[in-house]
Amino acid sequence: MSLSVTRENFDEWMVPVYVPAPFIPVRGEGSRLWDQQGKEYIDFAGGIAVNALGHAHPALREALNEQANRFWHTGNGYTNEPALRLAKKLIDATFAERVFFCNSGAEANEAALKLARKYAHDRVGNHKSGIVAFKNAFHGRTLFTVSAGGQPTYSQDFAPLPPDIRHAAYNDLNSASALIDDNTCAVIVEPVQGEGGVIPATKAFLQGLRELCDRYQALLIFDEVQTGVGRTGELYAYMHYGVTPDILTTAKALGGGFPIGAMLTTQNYASVMTPGTHGTTYGGNPLATAVAGKVLDIINTPEMQNGVRQRHDAFIERLNTLNVRFGMFSEIRGLGLLLGCVLQTEFAGKAKLIAQEAAKAGVMVLIAGGDVVRFAPALNVSDEEIATGLDRFALACERLQTGGAPCG
């Protein structure tokens, strides 16, 4: 007999680095979840842009079960067929010629930053070690990546931090230009700042970074952990902008809910990462890569990408209609199915309250700071689920605006 557990047990047994919702999901199907009490939720959070095909997708379950019945793990002393097939699919679909598999976005970004430093040290000299990142970015929770993130709240308790990392203002080419020089080995940027407020980069900004990196022989790293694998209506957001990075990191949606990350680059840059310079125990394991291979098969199609663009339009239309009614948002922005609603001044700081009320009404949403409500639903969310979920979201907005009876 299994142990009966409640939300209160989290506070008793777990390290308190999270404050989970008061309910515990126990079952999912598509874009719907049910909690321990059987209450249904429309999921517009998507595991923070992870569940690209929703919950318990039949094809992903089949891929996982098929590999689970073969073998699970061998370690990096051996390769495996699912990893090799996934690497080839990523190479065929992108600019990349080499792939490094890991377990998360943070690990992918850690690998990217290490590669950039080593390439510069090997080809130019140890003085070329500077990294330029951007304020309010998010690249992971390792000491290196959290230092690159440019959010002191996440890094200030862990000093001394890795040196030679400077932060420019996002979407401000003049600010970046003032920091990028001959000592810069890499520039790391999100095509859309997710945690920083769902802020898409301008094309001119990314083009300018590409030109600056070329001028100073620095590597341009695109962190596509949140924007990648179809999220923006292209397989990767760099395709939307027409700006090709030297290194791309991907994770989240790549596994559709199964942990996996990857760093993509060219043969020239990858050549400095010789045996022993970097590694991972679980990265590229056959379970993760079998699932990710199926995710790519489903998402990397014109039909799926066109569907994302159509669903983007449906979300925007309904959110604009909702905003006419409530007037709570000063801006609705984003690309594809990564969307952010910026709260008006009178509701500043209340994004979390809206998310909590939304859950009571039966819809799960995210926040991106205190002033932005974020949506990152499954890429195959249905029109009916969009309509139902946003009707429930409207109840939460009404509750916050009027102070009426709680939802649910």
UniProtKB/Swiss-Prot annotation:
GO terms for biological process: alpha-amino acid biosynthetic process; arginine catabolic process to glutamate; arginine catabolic process to succinate; ornithine catabolic process. Its cofactor is pyridoxal 5'-phosphate. It is an enzyme of class 2 (transferase). It holds the Pfam family Aminotran_3. Keywords: Aminotransferase, Arginine metabolism, Pyridoxal phosphate, Transferase. CDD domains: OAT_like. PROSITE patterns: AA_TRANSFER_CLASS_3. The keyword RNA-binding does not apply. GO terms for molecular function: identical protein binding; pyridoxal phosphate binding; succinylornithine transaminase activity. It comes from the Bacteria. The keyword Transferase applies. InterPro entries: Ac/SucOrn_transaminase_bac, AcOrn/SuccOrn_fam, Aminotrans_3, Aminotrans_3_PPA_site, Class-III_PLP-dep_AT, PyrdxlP-dep_Trfase, PyrdxlP-dep_Trfase_major, PyrdxlP-dep_Trfase_small. Gene3D superfamilies: Aspartate Aminotransferase, domain 1, Type I PLP-dependent aspartate aminotransferase-like (Major domain). It catalyses: N(2)-succinyl-L-ornithine + 2-oxoglutarate = N-succinyl-L-glutamate 5-semialdehyde + L-glutamate. Its EC number is 2.6.1.81. The modification N6-(pyridoxal phosphate)lysine is found at K252. Catalyzes the transamination of N(2)-succinylornithine and alpha-ketoglutarate into N(2)-succinylglutamate semialdehyde and glutamate. Can also act as an acetylornithine aminotransferase. Belongs to the class-III pyridoxal-phosphate-dependent aminotransferase family. AstC subfamily. NCBIfam families: arg_catab_astC, argD, PRK01278.1, PRK05093.1, PRK12381.1. This is Succinylornithine transaminase. The gene is astC.
